[in-house]
């Protein structure tokens, strides 16, 4: 498979390979065809079963001189479903001229096939003797993330290829390329609450047990909790009720069960299990059961060598001194942080997951130069 070395052509080739999560196949063929000619040994493997799988993962390694440092780029090739209402095909990689410069449209242009294309082009300009470089690429970041980066980490450890530093290409920039770098993320835990009672006729409440008042009282108590006031690098933790369901369509029936769902995004004052235990203890007073799923603990790569070299590279190419932040949702950095220090930096996120997702061609070009500077600095 012959591919142009131009960053737009590479981003287009990735976009044109549809890869709605969980991703396998063609898009990884494109990725391998980009990396193999650059001297990378590419290992691909598929794990998982429906509905969360199968998922394809890729680890590519270009070995540097003995004893050299090891820098890794990480990202995902899976994308969210395109939805309706696109002005051109979501996988057409439509390049359009606009008053502010050319834009490349397509699902994944921002999140994050554009960034991955920039990574590849950046590495192409780095000689092998500069050091060891790897790519940690999954097809399961936008989904449950069960069969993606976690088994990749297991493989990397098994082959003794742990990097010294990893950069994740998530779209961290807000208003313009370079204005924000992520050095950590809050933790995330979801909980399902079930209050059980006894069904009955509304005219005979003494023969029933209505679970709704108990669940409402529980939610009110939880909503009133102030978890913390934030910390040095994190915003305030927040608990949000995200669903309330009874499913009772009859006007004269007291339901037997009421359910709710909540999500907590929390900072480094907490762990997920402590929060689950706290909610469970409160729920017990209201005779309500709790089931929880932890999606990742809060983490931070404290400002230091890694953040300094990323910031310096960004400022050298954009003139912007980026803000170091821990805001936003979760990413696979929550897994990679167990492997090595990790920082996230990438394109502007205004159109990610939206209809007509698009990236400025100029941003792709500048991002390539930023990634090249970061890699060279990390290897030096």
Please state what every model-predicted region is.
Residues 1-2, 81, 172-176, 183, ...:
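Metal-dependent amide/peptide-bond hydrolase catalytic core
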Residues 74-76, 136-138, 167-170, 194-196, ...:
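Short beta-strand segments
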Residues 37-47, 95, 287-291, 319-324:
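Short secondary-structure junctions
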Residues 68-134, 363-366:
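Active-site metal-coordination/substrate-binding segment of hydrolases
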Residues 43, 72, 134-136, 289:
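A structural signal for isolated positions on well-ordered beta-strands in alpha/beta enzyme cores
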Residues 1-83, 257-263, 270, 274-281, ...:
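N-terminal helical capping/dimerization or prosegment-like subdomains
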Residues 103, 112-184:
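Acidic/histidine-rich catalytic neighborhood of metal-dependent amide-processing enzymes
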């Amino acid at each position: 498979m012959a591919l142009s070395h131009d960053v737009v052509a590479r981003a287009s080739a990735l976009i044109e390979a549809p890869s709605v999560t969980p991703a396998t196949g063609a898009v990884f063929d494109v990725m391998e065809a980009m990396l193999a000619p650059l001297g990378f040994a590419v290992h691909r493997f598929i794990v998982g079963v429906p509905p969360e799988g199968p998922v394809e993962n890729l680890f590519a390694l270009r070995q540097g001189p003995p004893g050299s440092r090891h820098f890794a780029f990480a990202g995902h090739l899976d994308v969210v479903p395109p939805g309706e209402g696109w002005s051109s095909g979501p996988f057409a990689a439509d390049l359009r001229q606009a008053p502010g410069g050319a834009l490349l449209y397509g699902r994944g242009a921002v999140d994050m096939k554009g960034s991955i294309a920039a990574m590849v082009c950046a590495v192409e300009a780095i000689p092998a003797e500069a050091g060891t470089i790897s790519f940690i690429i999954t097809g399961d970041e936008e989904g449950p993330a069960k069969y993606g980066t976690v088994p990749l980490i297991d493989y990397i450890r098994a082959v003794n290829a742990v990097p010294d530093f990893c950069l994740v290409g998530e779209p961290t920039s807000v208003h313009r390329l370079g204005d924000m770098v992520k050095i950590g993320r809050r933790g995330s835990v979801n909980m399902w609450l079930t209050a059980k009672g006894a069904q009955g006729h509304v005219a005979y409440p003494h023969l029933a047990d209505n679970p709704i008042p108990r669940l409402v009282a529980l939610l009110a108590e939880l909503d009133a909790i102030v978890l913390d006031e934030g910390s040095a690098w994190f915003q305030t933790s927040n608990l949000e009720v995200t669903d309330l369901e009874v499913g009772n369509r009859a006007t004269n029936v007291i339901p037997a069960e009421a359910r709710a769902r909540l999500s907590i995004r929390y900072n480094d004052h907490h762990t997920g299990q402590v929060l689950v235990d706290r909610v469970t203890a409160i729920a017990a007073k209201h005779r309500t059961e709790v089931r929880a799923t932890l999606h990742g603990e809060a983490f931070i790569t404290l400002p230091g060598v890694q953040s300094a070299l990323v910031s310096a590279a960004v400022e050298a190419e954009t003139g912007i001194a980026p803000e170091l932040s821990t805001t936003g949702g979760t990413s696979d950095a929550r897994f990679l942080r167990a492997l090595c220090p990790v920082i996230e930096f990438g394109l502007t996120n205004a159109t990610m997951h939206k209809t007509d997702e698009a990236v400025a061609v100029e941003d792709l070009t500048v991002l390539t130069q930023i990634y090249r500077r970061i890699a060279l600095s990390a290897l030096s």
